[in-house]
Every structure is written in C-alpha cells, then in structure tokens.
C-alpha cells in the first residue's frame, strides 16, 4: 500500500478480512503466499517506492509528510519535485528514505516470505541531482543486502522525469521490463500488417528488429561492462529481459487485434487519457462484431491467428516471458487502454469466457 509500505492493500482482501481489521488482512496475505508456495508458485510483490498516497504539495498529510516532509520527499528549496506523474515523489537521496525502503523489503521477505519484487517506476529509485545512476546508493544497497540476496528483483525501468527511460541500464541482478520487445513484436505482427493493407508499403516493424528481440535483446542488455571484463561482455543473462506484449496498462492482447484507437470514454476524461501509440490492428473492423455481421467469421479467425502468433513469439523468445492474466482467454477491455479506474467488467477477468 502506498499509505504504508509495511501493509498490504486492504481493498484486495476478502470482505470478511477487511471487516476483521488490518491483522486479518495481513494473515490472509500470509495464507495466500503459503498456499501458492504449496502449489509450486512463487510470489512477486508489486511495490511502489517512488511515491506515496499523500500526493503533491496540496495533498493530505497522512504519514511521511507529517513526520518529516523535507527529509522523505524530493523538494527543491521546499518546492515538491515530481518525476512520477502522481506527486509525492520520494527522495532516494535521503538516508531516511533508503532505510525505509530497505526495512520494507526485508519485512516482506522475512515475515511474509514473498519471493521477489517488481519495482514500479524504478528509475526514480536510482536518481540523484545529476539524473539516473546504475550505481546509486539505494540500488547498490538493495542488490547487496543479505536479506534480499536470494529474491528476484524486477524493475519497471522508466519514470516521467528527464532521462527517465533506462531499459537495460539497471545493475545485476535486476531484471527489467523490456518495452522494446513489446513495441517491436506489436509492430511486426500488427502495426506493420495494418500499414501494408492500407498503403502497400512496409510499416514500422522489421524482421531485423524482431530477430533481435527473439535473441534476447543483446543490444540493450550488454551495456554494462563490469571492471575487468572485455568490452562487449556482461554479467547479465538473457533472463534479465522481461519480455511482454501487454501489461496492466494498455490494450489487452484481444484488443490489440480488435481496435486501432483507444476507447476510454468510460474513464470520464473525454478519451484524452491513455496512449495513442498502440501499434495494433483491428483486422478490418473496429471493435467486436455482432453475430451475423458480414465477414465476422473471417475477421475473427484472422484475429485468433494473430494472437497465437504473438503468444508464440512471446513464449519462445530468449528471456523471461510475462503474460497478462486473461490474455490466454481472449480478455477484452472493450478498447479501453487505461482501465486503472475501472473496477467492473471492463477490467475483470471473465473466467467463463
């Protein structure tokens, strides 16, 4: 929870646990972890150490702001700085912030027994006054902490600040979400085909780019040459690339094959939110086709073929594949590519489909 780094998000617990209180919610999480382990699953916890629920300078004082605003939050002569797009950016230069993050990580490993962490907007954790540093004290502390030596560390390697895109630049043993894999696979199987059908000309995708992603994205994950190693070598194995085509943000796989424009009207922002760079292809019709529509079977068959091709590319590429829940079942968000605010059928997984 961005309210407290030592508590799970209570809204994800059962109604009974929520009613019983915070300890019941925590016990439910511990039970979940034990049962997943018993079934052979590891548990990766999504953590948000780049900002808190207190938001920007005009946000509420709920925890850290009331304790020591200038020590915990990134400010410039008292003015809040924001590289996350949410306000309330924590200051990774601060010793108190580093202690807080490390204590939280140790707690989840030692008390709840999670197997690893996915760090939201992880570039923020490696920033100082000059920008991002792979040898930032906080990142070094995380990768060298004895309590964390056996856990998996996964970075979302960007934020919205200057120089925020840092894919491939995190220190070992971090793995990283590979946005280039996402973009190039989408371009090859979807956007490029859409361009060819409309203009007859090649699009933005290419065989060379796809081959690079299939081979482990060595163009991005051999940038770090540790002291004493010949130039061009790296300690980072192909698994450091977390390959994905879809995630919690953006189109689902089904929607990549059924929509070319975002349809976020339900979010209440006049469809201004969400990216317009979707690299998708609707195969001849925008959105779902009603029963009996002309060419419906032909279009649906083409969409399924493309989805299978994308999934095969993801699963067979060198690296660590990440599959968004529901993509294997054709889950749709009805063209909404920014469904974070939709706690309804738009974002739910329909297990009956």
Regions found by a protein language model. Give the residues of each.
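Residue-level signal for pocket-adjacent positions within structured domains
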Residues: 1, 67, 78, 85, ...
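Substrate-binding/active-site clefts of carbohydrate-active enzymes
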Residues: 1-114, 118-147, 152, 163-164, ...
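Conserved alpha/beta catalytic core and glycan-binding cleft of carbohydrate-active enzymes
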Residues: 113, 128, 134-325, 340
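Carbohydrate-binding surfaces of carbohydrate-active enzymes
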Residues: 295, 351-352
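Short acidic/histidine-rich active-site segments
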Residues: 324-329, 333-335
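Acyl/amide activation-and-transfer machinery of modular secondary-metabolite enzymes
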Residues: 340-351
């Amino acid at each position: 929870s961005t309210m407290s780094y030592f508590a799970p998000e209570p809204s994800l617990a059962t109604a009974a646990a929520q009613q019983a209180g915070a300890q019941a919610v925590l016990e439910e999480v511990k039970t979940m972890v034990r049962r997943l382990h018993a079934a052979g699953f590891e548990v990766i916890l999504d953590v948000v150490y780049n900002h808190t629920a207190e938001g920007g300078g005009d946000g509420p004082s709920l925890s850290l702001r009331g304790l020591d605003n200038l020590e915990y939050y990134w400010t410039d002569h008292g003015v809040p700085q924001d590289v996350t797009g949410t306000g309330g950016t924590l200051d990774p230069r601060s010793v108190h912030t580093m202690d807080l993050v490390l204590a939280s990580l140790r707690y989840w490993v030692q008390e709840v027994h999670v197997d690893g962490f996915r760090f939201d907007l992880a570039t923020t954790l490696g920033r100082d006054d000059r920008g991002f540093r792979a040898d930032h004290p906080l990142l070094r502390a995380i990768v060298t902490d004895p309590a964390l030596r056996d856990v998996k560390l996964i970075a979302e390697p960007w934020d919205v600040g200057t120089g925020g895109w840092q894919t491939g630049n995190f220190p070992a043993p971090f793995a990283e979400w590979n946005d280039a894999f996402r973009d190039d696979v989408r371009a090859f199987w979807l956007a490029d085909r859409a361009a060819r059908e409309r203009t007859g000309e090649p699009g933005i995708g290419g065989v060379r780019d796809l081959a690079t992603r299939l081979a482990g994205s060595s163009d991005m994950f051999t940038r770090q040459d540790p002291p004493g190693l010949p130039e061009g070598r790296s300690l980072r194995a192909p698994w450091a690339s977390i390959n994905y085509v879809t995630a919690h943000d953006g189109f689902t796989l089904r929607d990549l094959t059924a929509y070319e424009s975002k349809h976020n009207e339900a979010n209440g922002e006049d469809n201004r939110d969400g990216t317009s760079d979707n690299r998708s292809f609707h195969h001849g019709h925008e959105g779902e086709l009603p029963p009996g529509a002309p060419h419906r079977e032909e279009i649906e068959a083409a969409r399924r073929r493309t989805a299978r091709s994308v999934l095969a590319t993801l699963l067979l590429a060198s690296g660590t594949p990440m599959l968004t829940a529901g993509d294997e079942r054709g889950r749709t968000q009805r063209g909404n590519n920014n469904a974070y605010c939709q706690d309804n059928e738009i974002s739910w997984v329909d297990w009956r489909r």
